[in-house]
Amino acid sequence: MTDICTICHNTPNRPVRLDCNHEFCYICIKGSIQNDMLNCAVCRRPFDSSIILNLSAQVCLKGDAPRDVDDDEEEVQDEEIDVKPDVNLLRAAMNANQNGNRELVAAAPHMNNNGNFHNAQGNYQVPTTSQGMVNQFGWPQFQAHSDFPYTLGYWGNQFPPFWNNAARNWGDVQQAANPVFAGNNQFLGNTQYNVFPPGQMGLPLPTTNIKMDIRDDEQNSVGGQQGMQTPTAGSDVPTAAQYNVQANFNVARVKFFWLYSSRGDGWWRFDQRCEKDIEDEFLANKPNMEMYLFGKPYILDFVAMRQWQKGNLDAWRQIKRVTSSEFDMHNVKGIAGCHVPNVWTVD
């Protein structure tokens, strides 16, 4: 018996043990059989193709694939990397402690030697009253001149990905190529910025105002704004733009499954490793993709949501991309042809 499948060189997924005691992934052995390769890939001992007939495995239908060998090697390599401390990070932490801020301080690559934040080009400096402090999102915050009583969140010319382009419509300040701060005539340069009402040192994530199921997978790919409250002047309710940003952030955490129709009733889930490749191509907006399934080339059409073996378009099957709750509404018999019995069934 080996620790890896010598066909795909990964940890065996739904392992099949041959008479010679060597183990392989179910999908790898099935592909070997469909290509008339009936010898063990390790010792070359012949095996009977009936070994996979009506094969079942006690695995979770929604489970992930075993951790790949390459993942373990990358983790070990990462541990061996010697990372030197960031001087700016240490300086920011010291300044934060002096101001009584005990929160975790993020790296501040746009802080100069005097502790002032500036833009990515370093052409402009902005006076601050909270040097080295960060908000709950881990990016610097500062209070501008007293004649400009708005709190600005600033990180060079960038923002955390799920807050970019948000919160620009509160207050009387709008985005400009070179905004002038009222009262101190200081330019921030060609940068993006967020504007918050007085007293708001960064907005909370708007999770409490979004109607959600107890599970994240109830958040669909275009929604996320159910139960939204209408913002009013001076209200703490985030704007529609912020809801859109938060909705997209929630969608990024949703897990999707890929199914293909059985020849009879029901559905099969794709092998988890194949599923990951399919999802990556789908998210890349590819109209179709070609991949090997069971050792044979298949075409997956994301427009018609069909798959077929290359060269045999007439024998197509339907495919689906579903959330966890949608998965439960389908009769999923197993994974890639391997039955997963219901161990709780009582006759």
Curated annotation (Swiss-Prot):
GO biological process: ubiquitin-dependent protein catabolic process; Wnt signaling pathway
Keyword Zinc-finger: yes
Zinc listed as a keyword: yes
Keywords associated with the record: Metal-binding, Zinc, Zinc-finger
Zinc finger map (RING-type): 5-44
SUPFAM superfamilies: RING/U-box, WWE domain
MF (Gene Ontology): poly-ADP-D-ribose binding; ubiquitin protein ligase activity; ubiquitin-protein transferase activity; zinc ion binding
Gene3D superfamilies: 3.30.720.50, Zinc/RING finger domain, C3HC4 (zinc finger) (3.30.40.10)
Superkingdom of source: Eukaryota
Domain (WWE): residue spans on this chain: 244-321
GO cellular component, one term: nucleus
PANTHER family: E3 UBIQUITIN-PROTEIN LIGASE RNF146 (PTHR13417:SF2)
Descriptive protein name: Uncharacterized RING finger protein C02B8.6
